[in-house]
Regions:
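A short acidic, glycine/proline-enriched capping/turn motif at secondary-structure boundaries
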Residues: 73-76, 91, 101, 141-143
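Short, flexible, mixed-charge acidic loops at enzyme active sites
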Residues: 82-95, 147-158
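Active-site loop segments of alpha/beta catalytic cores
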Residues: 113-274
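Short glycine/proline- and acidic residue-enriched helix-loop micro-motifs
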Residues: 37-40, 99-109, 161-167
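A gly/proline- and charged-residue-enriched helix-loop-helix capping module
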Residues: 89-127
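Metal- and O2-centered redox machinery and metal/ROS homeostasis
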Residues: 1-14, 109-112, 183, 188, ...
Length: 274
């Protein structure tokens, strides 16, 4: 467990913040490139020992404070029966519609397909020094919905926005599986699990608060103080909900270069993860 990382989650002032690689290993890291030359991306994710080797690269080369599970946020969609390959970008076998929503596998059938992530966390934790922390991650509900509907996250997400009435019934199937996915990673030794919601900023604050926040609350209530949350491109108006306030159930929030850190410190009294 890394002291600097724990201090950041507890909002304890410190001279040096914790450092970790946002992109797991870093696509431009020579250690990653050498492994990628020998193995497919899918193989690197699904072989627990390989995934641990990738995750350890930044720790061994730069002595960072925190490692993060090497994986991909789309694996829950694969587990739900949507198919997945990388050629080189991710490609799903089919896209979500009102007609095929019923074809998605439920959590009890899908969960075994995510067991490899728990094993990858276990292998990474074995290799990490005790002074380092370990983060797991899953995709945020809206981001997974976007990929399910469109097959990619690009542009203004017009198709996802038109399909927003599908979001709630999709979450009724997705969230039980995400809870199992998060639990697997925590059981494997992750200190917290990040929710990466890279599509969230494409929605207006009103639409985000009305549709996305209820799904986030369900996850946060299931794992109080065990989840971090980063939503790309959101504005202060997106986070005007008690979920992001002083008594937030999240372990910490992530903020990017679009934010004035003075606003983040003023409006959000909980911990910080990035």
């Amino acid at each position: 467990m890394n002291v600097r990382f724990q201090n950041a989650l507890k909002r304890i002032p410190q001279a040096v913040p914790p450092v970790w690689f946002m992109r797991q290993a870093g696509r431009y890291h020579k250690h990653y490139q050498a492994l990628r030359a020998k193995h497919s991306f899918m193989e690197m994710c699904k072989d627990p020992k390989l995934a641990a080797e990738v995750a350890m690269g930044p720790i061994e080369d730069f002595d960072f404070d925190v490692a993060i599970l090497f994986s991909d946020l789309l694996f829950p969609l694969e587990a739900m029966g949507m198919g997945l390959k990388y050629d080189p970008a991710p490609q799903l076998g089919w896209h979500l519609t009102e007609e095929n929503l019923k074809d998605l596998k439920r959590w009890d059938e899908a969960k075994p397909a995510l067991e490899f992530q728990k094993q990858a966390v276990i292998e990474t934790r074995k290799r990490l020094p005790e002074s380092k922390s370990l983060i797991g991650f899953v995709g945020g509900p809206l981001t997974l919905f976007t990929y399910a509907v469109e097959g990619a996250h690009k542009g203004g997400l017009e198709k996802s926005k038109r399909s927003l009435p599908l979001f709630k019934p999709f979450c009724e199937i997705l969230l039980p599986l995400l809870k199992e996915n998060i639990q697997l990673q925590l059981e494997g030794g992750a200190e917290i699990v990040m929710l990466f919601d890279t599509a969230a900023g494409e929605l207006s604050p009103r639409v985000y608060l009305e549709n996305v926040v209820p799904a986030l609350k369900e996850l946060a209530q299931a794992f109080p103080k065990k989840l971090g949350y980063y939503a790309k491109g959101v504005l202060p108006a997106h986070l005007r909900d008690e979920l992001f306030g002083e008594d937030s159930l999240f372990a910490g929030l992530g903020f990017d270069h679009r934010w004035d850190l003075r606003d983040a410190f003023r409006d959000h009294r909980g911990g910080f993860v990035q």
